[in-house]
Design a protein with these regions (language model features):
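Cleavable N-terminal export/targeting peptides
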Residues: 1-31, 257
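Residue-level signature of outer-membrane beta-barrel architecture
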Residues: 26, 40-42, 58-60, 104-106, ...
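Transmembrane beta-strand segments of Gram-negative outer membrane beta-barrel proteins
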Residues: 27-42, 65-69, 195
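Hydrophobic, lipid-facing positions within transmembrane beta-strands of outer-membrane proteins
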Residues: 32-34, 50-56, 96-100, 117, ...
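Transmembrane beta-barrel strands of outer-membrane/channel proteins
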Residues: 38-40, 56, 69-75, 115-119, ...
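Solvent-exposed loop/turn segments connecting transmembrane beta-strands
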Residues: 42-50, 90-93, 121-129, 202-211, ...
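Repeated loop/turn-to-beta-strand initiation elements of outer-membrane beta-barrel proteins
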Residues: 64-68, 108-113, 145-149, 189-195, ...
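Outer-membrane beta-barrel "beta-signal"
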Residues: 216-219, 245-257
């Protein structure tokens, strides 16, 4: 646990230090962009379920820096049939994610050198905890009025708690160097609708993690959107009693502050 805490603290300190340095030398005007999204479902009667997912995305723009902070949570309760035939409400999904990224802007606002860190805690996933740190280069490869494509790549390091035996709570610790790549496509095909595709890969010797988030957003008002999406998380190295791929379909209400 200390290893994860130290890694996460180091990333956050690096982000804070870089931002403070830029503020002290350049004293630019600060610009904040904050969006929050929430989705929840509850059913009663013959089937009782409760599910919740939420996300907050904060972007801080300065003259030569762009910082981004993301936090999300997924929680679900379901009725589960026991060995004796009775049904009992149990938690079937509980996942938390947080990331921080600090990017130094180069010739234009889209080319950058970045430092990135993330931490995932998944009570029911193939990995109970997964922490990464990386640095690299990012750029915008398509820049049109309604269509953009951003991508980044760089080396990094990961720490993972692999669930080897769920019933006996046997955890195997893994760590090692990795290469991280990520891309995001945005297509505003009408004035009120936007398609978004995010892809990411963290390639290491022990495990490769792939992440995909596909979504369609439609405007309800200037500040509010309805968002329908589908996420895929895939790990290549999992225990025999674990699935390598987790998927989530969601409908969220998004508010832009």
């Amino acid at each position: 646990m200390k290893m994860y805490t130290t890694a996460a603290a180091g990333v956050l300190l690096a982000v804070a230090a870089s931002s403070s340095l830029a503020q002290g030398e350049l004293k630019p005007e600060k610009t904040w962009e904050v969006s929050a999204e929430l989705g929840a479902i509850r059913t009663t009667g013959n089937t009782e379920t409760e599910s919740f997912n939420g996300k907050i995305d904060v972007v801080h723009r300065m003259e030569n820096w762009k910082n981004q902070y993301i936090a999300s949570a997924l929680y679900k309760n379901d009725q589960v049939e026991q060995d004796d035939g009775t049904e009992q409400t149990e938690t079937t999904a509980e996942k938390y994610f947080a990331s921080a990224k600090s990017a130094y802007l180069l010739a234009d606002e889209f080319s950058n050198l970045f430092v990135y860190g993330s931490h995932t805690h998944d009570e029911f996933g193939a990995y109970r905890k997964y922490t990464t740190v990386s640095a690299g280069y990012g750029a915008r490869f398509i820049k049109r009025e309604s269509l953009t494509l951003d991508a980044e790549i760089g080396p990094g390091y990961f720490w993972g708690d692999k669930v080897e035996d769920e019933d006996n709570d046997i955890i195997v610790k893994e760590e090692g160097f990795m290469v991280r790549t990520a891309a995001e496509l945005k297509w505003a095909f009408t004035d009120n609708a936007t398609f978004n595709q995010k892809l990411g890969a963290e390639v290491a010797e022990d495990n490769t993690r792939y992440v995909s988030d596909t979504s369609l957003s439609t405007k309800i008002s200037d500040r509010m959107q309805m968002k329908v999406g589908y996420t895929v998380n895939h790990d290549t190295d999992v225990a025999d009693d674990k699935e390598g791929t987790d998927t989530t379909t969601y409908i969220n209400l998004v508010y832009n502050f």
